[in-house]
Regions:
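DNA-contacting surface of Y-family translesion DNA polymerases
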Residues: 1-114, 124-134, 138
Length: 138
């Protein structure tokens, strides 16, 4: 019975209703690189661009988040995700960048060849509940 269901789904036959107005559970961005990143410095520079985009999306959505998730995909397509939850919600790229950088440094393999980096914020709350002006957490 389950096998038939998955066969139909694989054939794009799915009659379930689509809800285009679902509540967003996370806001993030990721980048695939044409050449593998091999140094922490190049990865840190890429993270700056990524967290800037996440900040812009969070500002547009008027959200703040408690949990940051870093995604690392290596050249051999192995992938890891690591998360950290903070006590106060954040929205600023500087705070997200510092936290993402710390996760990267802690979990990066020796002699890495990174193909993709991503950052997402989850445990979202409306920004107006905590105020639009976020104080630095660091």
């Amino acid at each position: 019975k389950v096998g038939r269901h998955y066969f139909r789904v694989a054939q794009a036959q799915d009659n379930r209703r689509v809800n285009p107005n679902r509540i967003r559970k996370s806001i993030g961005a990721e980048r695939s690189f044409t050449e593998d990143l091999r140094t922490l410095e190049t990865m840190a520079a890429a993270l700056v661009t990524i967290v800037d985009e996440v900040e812009a999306r969070m500002l547009k959505a008027k959200k703040m988040g408690y949990t940051l998730t870093l995604k690392i995909k290596y050249a051999d397509y192995r992938q890891i995700t690591r998360s950290r939850t903070v006590d106060l919600p954040m929205q600023q790229a500087t705070d997200m960048g510092i936290l993402a950088q710390a996760l990267l440094e802690h979990h990066l393999e020796p002699q890495p060849r990174v193909r993709l980096l991503g950052v997402a914020m989850a445990n979202l709350v409306p920004a107006q509940l905590v105020g639009y002006q976020q104080l630095s957490l660091l």
